[in-house]
A protein has these predicted regions:
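Canonical Radical SAM [4Fe-4S] cluster-binding loop centered on the CxxxCxxC motif
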Residues: 1-46
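N-terminal pre-core extensions flanking Radical SAM catalytic domains
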Residues: 4-7, 27-30, 217, 221-231
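Short, flexible/disordered intra-domain loops and linkers
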Residues: 41-42, 75, 133, 165-166, ...
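Distinct, well-ordered alpha-helical segments
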Residues: 73-82, 102-112, 165-169
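Short, aromatic/basic amphipathic alpha-helical patches
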Residues: 79-84, 107-111, 197-212
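Conserved C-terminal portion of the radical SAM core fold
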Residues: 140-197, 204-226
Length: 231
């Protein structure tokens, strides 16, 4: 599995895929990333350190993802991320977190004092019924502005039966209204019961994507490995 890469288009940054103890919300119907986990924090740190040692700081910006939330990374890994940022001139670091951990974000910012911490939330869609009844995301808030209040960036998931051009456009517009940047992920076949809908994907690619392909605030991942990490 590739765990280090560089994103050179749009917001240039290095990216690392680290390993935590396991996603606290493994019930999302569309996701099997939570299989990338280990209960042994010492083993996790050893792996994560080897990945972080590849970071150069050349862009001054680092995105850190794991198969869950940043709060599932061990304390040694978090401290090492901070050290790497300080030592290699990284002034901006991006982390991902589930909505349920939003109240822990201020403490994380304090821990990374002097570094601009950007928090990304996996929203998937602002359609409450679709998100909770179909995707089983576990976000009990329906108001977009409240969901986004503690976050600067958001992940959205398109290409599933039941989504329409109107629903996808609404998600993008609301995401750009309440967040600094968004990342659109196209559903890829995996081990879950949620499968890609080629008609919905074609609608996005042909009718929506051209409007945002060059938008510096919008990342678009047709494949889940387009950032160069994962497998």
């Amino acid at each position: 599995m590739d765990r280090y890469s560089k994103i050179v288009e749009k917001q240039a940054r290095e990216i690392v895929l680290l390993r935590g103890t396991g996603c606290a919300c493994p019930s999302c119907a569309f996701c099997d990333y939570h299989d990338d986990k280990c209960a042994d924090e010492t083993a996790n740190f050893q792996l994560n350190k080897s990945v972080l040692d590849a970071v150069t700081g050349e862009f001054g910006e680092l995105e850190v993802i794991n198969s869950g939330s940043v709060f599932e990374l061990d304390s040694q890994t978090l401290a090492y991320i901070r050290d790497v940022c300080y030592q290699r001139g990284i002034s901006v670091v991006h982390f991902e977190s589930h909505y349920i951990f939003r109240e822990r974000i201020p403490a994380l910012r304090s821990f990374f004092e002097g570094i601009d911490v950007k928090m990304k939330i996996g929203i998937e869609t602002f359609d409450f019924e679709f998100r909770e009844q179909v995707l089983n995301k576990g976000i009990d808030e329906s108001a977009p502005e409240l969901i986004c209040a503690a976050f600067q960036e958001g992940n959205f998931l398109f290409g599933i039966s039941g989504q329409t051009r109107a629903s996808m456009e609404r998600d993008i517009q609301l995401g750009l209204r309440y967040l600094e940047r968004i990342c659109i992920n196209i559903m890829c076949k995996n081990t879950t019961s949620i499968t890609p809908d080629e008609k919905v994907i074609r609608c996005f690619v042909e009718e929506i994507m051209p409007q945002y392909a060059d938008d510096q605030r919008v990342d678009i991942l047709i494949s889940n490995t387009d950032f160069g990490v994962g497998d």
